[in-house]
């Protein structure tokens, strides 16, 4: 009886051992990569310095949940978070969630972003035909050269203040194999003004009564930037000059044959969609800003070509965005719908 019990115990001990070995073997995919299970994440800190925007500190992380790994390299849940900010009001705060398992047979993507920008680029209208003079904003270290270059205005001449808030909720479903439909809603909030020169100058904001000039590296707050001039000349309407809020609706089709969503090594991703964007400015009211309701069409094509196994991939993309109805405010002309 004791021998039978010992033999039974031996079987119970040995069988789990074989099962564990078998499970360990299965934790490698067809390319020899280790299959990830459970929760995985990485953190990347960031430190930077800009002469005008100051010191930056921040970090980003991407958290993935793979469950038992049976669907790897596809994840079950993905949460991306990023926060970075400078001492002169520039940064990004973003949270993004993505999953095709929270709602069965549908992919849900949620994104909330806030981007303060104390010195956002503004080079005027009409693309390459607009006048650009680098001497307007290129500060020279040698004060004698600065005296010769009378064109110099301010390092903030081609800048303006733009804070952007964005929230988006998108859902995707399958029509047939790699062909999918997608729809989404969201809101864009633009808060715009001229650059805060006093804040940007900081300790350099010193005015010398004797010379009637600011400190050598300080920007003169009495000098108008291109944005202020456009408002003054009427090229930028008062109803759009300070920004506004824009709820939008989106719908389209997608073709996706990529082998994986993150870091694909082969396949094609193409989408075509329409976005209808409304406009509202609390100061001027809906009637004044209704002229900025507009409809846009987007087409994007991405192709991933394997060069060496899954180690080296050649990728290229083309895309277009066209306003097909209505008028978009000037600050949204550089925003690319995705």
What are these regions (language model features)?
Residues 1-30:
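Cleavable N-terminal export/targeting peptides
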Residues 30-33, 259-261:
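Short beta-strand/turn micro-motifs at beta-sheet edges
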Residues 33-42, 48-241:
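Gram-negative/organellar outer-membrane beta-barrel architecture
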Residues 41-43, 57-59, 91-95, 163-169, ...:
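Hydrophobic, lipid-facing positions within transmembrane beta-strands of outer-membrane proteins
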Residues 64-68, 82-88, 115-119, 190-192, ...:
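Sequence/structural signature of outer-membrane beta-barrel proteins
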Residues 167-183, 244-259, 264-267:
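Extended amphipathic secondary-structure runs
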């Amino acid at each position: 009886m004791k021998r039978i019990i010992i033999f039974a115990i031996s079987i119970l001990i040995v069988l789990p051992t074989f099962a564990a070995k078998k499970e360990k073997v299965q934790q490698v995919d067809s390319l020899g990569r280790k299959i990830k299970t459970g929760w995985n994440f990485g953190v990347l800190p960031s430190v930077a310095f800009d002469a005008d925007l100051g010191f930056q500190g921040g970090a980003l992380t991407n958290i993935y949940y793979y469950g038992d790994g049976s669907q790897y390299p596809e994840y079950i849940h993905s949460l991306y978070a990023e926060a970075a900010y400078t001492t002169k009001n520039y940064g990004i705060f973003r949270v993004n969630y993505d999953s095709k398992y929270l709602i069965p047979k549908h992919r849900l993507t949620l994104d909330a972003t806030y981007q303060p920008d104390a010195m956002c680029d503004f080079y005027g209208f009409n693309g390459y035909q607009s006048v650009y003079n680098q001497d307007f904003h290129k500060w020279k270290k040698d004060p004698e050269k600065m005296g010769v270059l009378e064109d110099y205005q301010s390092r903030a001449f081609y800048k303006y203040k733009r804070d952007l808030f964005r929230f988006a909720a998108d859902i995707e479903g399958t029509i047939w194999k790699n062909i999918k439909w997608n729809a989404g809603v969201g809101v864009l909030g633009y808060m715009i003004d001229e650059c805060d020169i006093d804040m940007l100058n900081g300790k350099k904001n010193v005015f010398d009564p004797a010379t009637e000039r600011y400190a050598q590296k300080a920007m003169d707050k009495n000098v108008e930037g291109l944005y202020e001039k456009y408002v003054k000349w009427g090229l930028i309407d008062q109803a759009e000059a300070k920004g506004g809020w824009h709820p939008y609706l989106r719908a389209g089709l997608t073709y996706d044959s990529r082998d994986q969503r993150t870091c694909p090594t082969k396949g094609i991703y193409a989408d075509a969609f329409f976005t209808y964007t409304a406009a509202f400015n609390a100061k001027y009211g809906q009637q004044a800003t209704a002229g900025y309701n507009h409809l846009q069409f987007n087409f994007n094509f991405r192709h991933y070509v394997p060069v060496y196994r899954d180690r080296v991939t050649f990728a290229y993309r083309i895309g277009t965005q066209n306003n097909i109805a209505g008028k978009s405010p000037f600050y949204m002309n550089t925003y690319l719908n995705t």
